[in-house]
């Protein structure tokens, strides 16, 4: 079982927001998450992102793989995903 840190789509039609979650890689996009690590609101005037960095570091140390989109969001917001990867 491979575990990934990725986005889970929420919200209404044309007004999405995303939760940053830990999921089994075989789970569907909107499936059951193991743990929620934060959120990302792309539609707001000021795009909001909040992440529990300590929990993310813990999951990465356990072998969780970041999705490409989550890596991009972390790099854009200076949260240094690369320095957290094992």
Curated annotation (Swiss-Prot):
Keywords carried by this UniProt record: Ribonucleoprotein, Ribosomal protein
UniProt keyword annotation of Cell wall biogenesis/degradation present: no
Gene Ontology molecular functions: structural constituent of ribosome
SUPFAM superfamilies to which the protein is assigned, alphabetical: Ribosomal protein S16 (SSF54565)
GO cellular component terms given for this protein: cytoplasm; small ribosomal subunit
UniProt xrefs under HAMAP family: Ribosomal_bS16
Protein name: Small ribosomal subunit protein bS16
Gene: rpsP
